[in-house]
Curated annotation (Swiss-Prot):
Keywords: Hydrolase, Metal-binding, Pyrimidine biosynthesis, Zinc
Organism: Bacillus thuringiensis (strain Al Hakam)
Protein name: Dihydroorotase
GO CC terms, sorted: cytoplasm
Encoding gene per record: pyrC
Active site: D304
Function recorded in the entry: Catalyzes the reversible cyclization of carbamoyl aspartate to dihydroorotate.
Positions contributing to substrate binding: H61, L62, R63, N93, N277, H308, F322, G323
Positions that bind Zn(2+) 1: H59, H61, D151, D304
InterPro entries according to UniProt: Amidohydro-rel, DHOase, DHOase/Allantoinase_Hydrolase, Dihydroorotase_CS, Metal-dep_hydrolase_composite, Metal_Hydrolase
C-alpha cells in the first residue's frame, strides 16, 4: 500500500518545523514537500499533526526468551509501536543470553517471526553475562548483534572490559555499559539520600555509578573504542563524561525519561513502581542531567523499558525488581514536562529520540529523507490524555506515572511503509 500524508508538519534539515506532505511508495519515503499529488496512494489527512521520523530507542528489555511472563517480543514491540518507536535495541539479559551462535540465531528467528517494529539485538560481552569468559564477538556480529553489553550488571573485571573494548574496536563496534561498582551497591533499593534515610532503606550511593564510568572511560581511551554509557543518573557521571569528551575520548551517553522528569523528592512513599536502576537521584543530579543533555554531554534519550508483573512489583520496595515500563509514556512525558515548560525545544526532543541515537550508532534511521525506509510516527501535539496503565499494550503496567495528564501522543506508527499501530479514529 502507498500512502500520501497531507497537511502535516515536520522538522526539515535546517531543524525547523515546517508544513509538509509526505508520500510513501513501496515501503520508502518517495517525496517530502508541500502540495504533493499522487495516483495509487491512500490519502491520509493528518490535519496539522507532526510527521516525525520513527523514534529510535537504544535501550529496551523485551524479556523473551525466558521472561515471557513479563513481556514478549510481540507485546513489547506492539507497545513500542504505540509509543511511536520504529527501531529498538534489545538488551541481552534474557534466558538464555544471546552469547553464542545458537542463542543469537534463536533470538533473531523469534524477532523475524514476532516483531512489529525493527528490533536490533545486543550481543553479550561475557558468557551468561557472568563476567568471566568473553563471547565470540565476531560470530555475534556476523549474526546481527547491534553492539556488545552485559546490561543489567556491570563488568567488574577491568582486564575483561579492556579486552572486550579492544576486540570491539577491531570490529568497529561499540561497547555499551550498565555502570555499577558492585562493592558500592550496598544492597540498596533506592538512592542513598534523603528518601533512604527517611524510610530506613539501604541506599545506592551516586559514586557507585560514576566511579565505574570513570574507570571505563580510561579503558576506552586505551582501547580506542566507542564506549556508550547507559542511563546516566548522577552529577558526578555527567562531569566525568563531559571531561572525557573534551579530551577527545570516544564516549557517548544516554539518559532516561524518568530521570529527566523525576528525582528522589518526587517519590511519594515506598512505592515499588518508583524503584528503578539506577535509582531516582537528588535535585542536583537531576539538574546536572538536564544541563548535560543541553550542552551535548548526554547524546540521546532512551527509555530503559523494563516490564515486570504486578505480583513481582507487589513484593515491596526492598524485594521488588528494579525497572519501569517506558515505551508508551516516553514522548508525551517528555513533551509535556520538558518542551511545554520551555526546558528544551520540540526540535531538540525530536533529535534526542531520532537522529542522535541513529547517528551515534550508524543506523539508517532517524530522518525523513527521500529514498529511505518509511519508518514514520504521526504525533498529535494537542491531544491531552491521562496515563492509564490498564490501556498499555505492554504486559508490564509498572509505571510511576499513572494518572499524569500529558500532551503529545503518537496516533500512528509506520514501519517499513506499513501501518504497525494506529489510534482508533485518530486520522479518520
Amino acid at each position: 500500500m502507498n500512502y500520501l500524508f497531507k497537511n502535516g508538519r515536520y522538522m526539515n534539515e535546517e531543524g525547523k518545523i515546517v508544513a509538509t506532505d509526505l508520500l510513501v511508495q513501496d515501503g520508502k519515503i518517495a517525496k517530502v514537500a508541500e502540495n504533493i499529488t499522487a495516483d495509487n496512494a491512500e490519502v491520509i489527512d493528518v490535519n496539522g499533526k507532526l510527521i516525525a521520523p520513527g523514534l529510535v530507542d537504544v535501550h529496551v528489555h523485551l524479556r523473551e526468551p525466558g521472561g515471557e511472563h513479563k513481556e514478549t517480543i510481540e507485546t513489547g514491540t506492539l507497545a513500542a509501536a504505540k509509543g511511536g518507536f520504529t527501531t529498538i535495541c534489545a538488551m541481552p539479559n534474557t534466558r538464555p543470553v544471546p552469547d553464542c551462535r545458537e542463542h543469537m540465531e534463536d533470538l533473531q528467528n523469534r524477532i523475524k517471526e514476532k516483531a512489529h517494529v525493527n528490533v536490533l539485538p545486543y550481543g553479550a560481552i561475557t558468557v551468561r553475562q557472568a563476567g568471566s569468559e568473553m563471547t565470540d564477538f565476531e560470530t555475534l556480529k556476523e549474526l546481527g548483534a547491534f553492539a556488545f553489553t552485559d546490561d543489567g550488571v556491570g563488568v567488574q573485571d577491568a582486564s575483561m572490559m579492556l579486552a572486550a573494548m579492544k576486540r570491539a574496536a577491531k570490529l568497529n563496534m561499540a561497547v555499551v555499559a550498565h555502570c555499577e561498582e558492585n562493592t558500592l551497591i550496598n544492597k540498596g533499593c533506592v538512592h542513598e539520600g534523603k528518601f533512604s534515610e527517611k524510610h530506613g532503606l539501604n541506599g545506592i550511593p551516586s559514586v557507585c555509578e560514576s566511579v565505574h564510568i570513570a574507570r571505563d572511560i580510561l579503558l576506552a581511551e586505551a582501547a580506542d573504542c566507542h564506549y556508550h554509557v547507559c542511563h546516566v543518573s548522577t552529577k558526578g557521571s555527567v562531569r566525568v563524561i563531559r571531561d572525557a569528551k573534551r579530551a577527545g575520548i570516544k564516549v557517548t551517553a544516554e539518559v532516561t525519561p524518568h530521570h529527566l522528569v523525576l528525582c528522589e523528592d518526587d517519590i511519594p512513599s515506598a512505592d515499588p513502581n518508583f524503584k528503578m536502576n539506577p535509582p531516582l537521584r537528588g535535585k542536583e543530579d537531576h539538574a546536572a542531567l538536564i544541563e548535560g543533555l543541553l550542552d551535548g554531554t548526554i547524546d540521546m534519550i532512551a527509555t530503559d523499558h523494563a516490564p515486570h508483573t504486578a505480583e513481582e512489583k507487589a513484593q515491596g520496595i526492598e524485594r521488588a525488581p528494579f525497572g519501569i515500563t517506558g515505551f508508551e509514556t516516553a514522548f508525551p512525558l517528555l513533551y509535556t514536562n520538558l518542551v511545554k515548560k520551555g526546558i528544551i525545544t520540540l526540535e531538540q526532543l525530536i533529535q534526542f529520540l531520532t537522529e542522535k541515537p541513529a547517528d551515534t550508532f550508524g543506523l539508517e534511521a532517524g530522518r525523513l529523507k527521500e529514498g529511505r525506509t518509511a519508518d514514520i510516527t504521526i504525533i498529535d501535539l494537542e491531544q491531552e490524555e491521562e496515563i492509564d496503565p490498564t490501556t498499555f499494550l505492554s504486559k508490564g503496567k509498572n509505571t510511576p506515572f499513572a494518572g499524569w495528564k500529558c500532551q503529545g501522543w503518537p496516533v500512528m506508527t509506520i514501519v517499513g511503509g506499513k501501518i504497525a499501530w494506529q489510534k482508533e479514529s485518530a486520522l479518520v
